[in-house]
Amino acid sequence: MQTRNTFSWIKEQITRSISASLMIYIITRTSISNAYPIFAQQGYENPREATGRIVCANCHLANKPVDIEVPQAVLPDTVFEAVVRIPYDTQLKQVLANGKKGGLNVGAVLILPEGFELAPPDRISPEIKEKMGNLSFQSYRPNQKNILVIGPVPGQKYSEITFPILSPDPATKKDIHFLKYPIYVGGNRGRGQIYPDGSKSNNTVYNATASGIVSKILRKEKGGYEITIADASDGRQVVDIIPPGPELLVSEGESIKLDQPLTSNPNVGGFGQGDAEIVLQDPLRVQGLLFFFAAVILAQIFLVLKKKQFEKVQLSEMNF
């Protein structure tokens, strides 16, 4: 009986350990994989402001390039590629949250016209799937299927991101028309400088909050500094906290001014946005255009044949 109780207790403990480990894994993985989209999704109903600015620029302060490539025109109910390129020097290392150096991650938000959406898996060709890799896209909101987000993902592997897009069919969606539509994109590489709550990350420069003399610099056990500034005017002391990551530029006894940089700027990433245009083409218009081209070609052929026939008649009359 005692042996049975012991085995039951061991089994219960193992089950609890596995459950706890699984929960930690899920929570950690979710926080890492969703970090980029959640910052924008939680704070903004729409990622693109009325001014045209994409809200990611509020946290990623450095301006960097981004490029998007889409077909000039697509037919209704067709899967096509939207390729977003986020170029950067892959040799660069960024400051991580713990102050150590690591590789840059990338993320992107793609704002499609109404009606355009992520292609379902069964409609994506093997060629496009190969270009996509193991990426997992999601909608910005459940009711905003035309706005897609991805990231953060490793920049070395995914500096070029292929979105599989399904075009709408005006035959089934009456609010969709055969027109030229704009597409907007935002892409970042590296961590941001400001969190959504307005606080600074450790991936930015820290400035002095007072002018005076640096009376003390205390290096923290887990990294970072406490810098004590003695205000020369009233003698009060101000303590500036520097997190792990940025390199210190000042030393004890140094005279500094208000807003003078206390650290270097460790940021090597940045955010960029761009746009493109795509035409939702009417198949009947394409067929009509092809018919017109065929008619022109046939007319040219008949003219050539008629000309040769006329030349033969003229030649025979001259010989006669």
UniProtKB/Swiss-Prot annotation:
GO terms for cellular component: chloroplast thylakoid membrane. The keyword Transmembrane applies. GO terms for molecular function: electron transfer activity; heme binding; iron ion binding. Residues 1-35 form the signal peptide. PANTHER family: CYTOCHROME F (PTHR33288:SF10), PTHR33288. The chain crosses the membrane at residues 286-306. One of its GO terms (biological process) is photosynthesis. The 4 large subunits of the cytochrome b6-f complex are cytochrome b6, subunit IV (17 kDa polypeptide, petD), cytochrome f and the Rieske protein, while the 4 small subunits are PetG, PetL, PetM and PetN. The complex functions as a dimer. PROSITE patterns: CYTF. Binds 1 heme group covalently. This is Cytochrome f. It is a single-pass membrane protein. Belongs to the cytochrome f family. The gene is petA. It comes from Helianthus annuus. Heme binds at residues 36, 56, 59-60.
